[in-house]
Amino acid sequence: MKLYLSYSLLLVMSLFLSSCAIVPLKTIKEDKNALKNSAEQGYLLLAINTDVRISSVELKSDSSFTLNDFVWLNDRNYFFAPLPKGQYTLTKINLFYNGYYELDFDDVSFSFNIAPNQINYGGELRIKRGYGGSASFELINRSSLALEFLEAKYPNILSEKQVIYQGPGNDDFFGLVLNSTSSPILESEQ
């Protein structure tokens, strides 16, 4: 009977731990559409600008994901990969020297949405080191730099998919720049 209880407890603990597993994600390397099911997935584009050496960033949704494979361009790390649609929150920044920073899970300023069949720009996570091991965090909108990254690294995907800003606040920069044939600024000056 004791052996049966031990095996049952081991099975329950194994199931619990496997449900808490963090799924590692990698930035796509090739400039071709990697969405397996476009009705259920969208691309995440996230920039990280920091003076702290980070090893990974964790996201929480229905599942937990870790981003640890970045592409460097214009003094920023970028992460670009398909994710299931839904609401995501940045939860943890892991550092190279075995430390980490936990972010406030309830703070909407660290949240963004992944809409299906689109490139979803979540923003630029800015991390600045403070004194005594502290740091400050912001998720800001740098859409023009994100567009430069997509044009340089993923022009084919950019030509196939709509890009939308999904970070804190509202911004229609991508809609104005990518979906117009002429500049509304130039037209108004004439």
Residue ranges and their predicted role:
Residues 1-9:
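Bacterial N-terminal signal peptides that target proteins for export
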Residues 61-82:
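Tryptophan-paired
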Residues 20-65, 99-190:
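Primarily secretory-pathway and cell-envelope proteins
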Residues 75-89, 94-96:
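Short Pro-Gly-centered beta-turn/loop motif in secreted/extracellular proteins
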Residues 8-18:
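Bacterial N-terminal signal peptides
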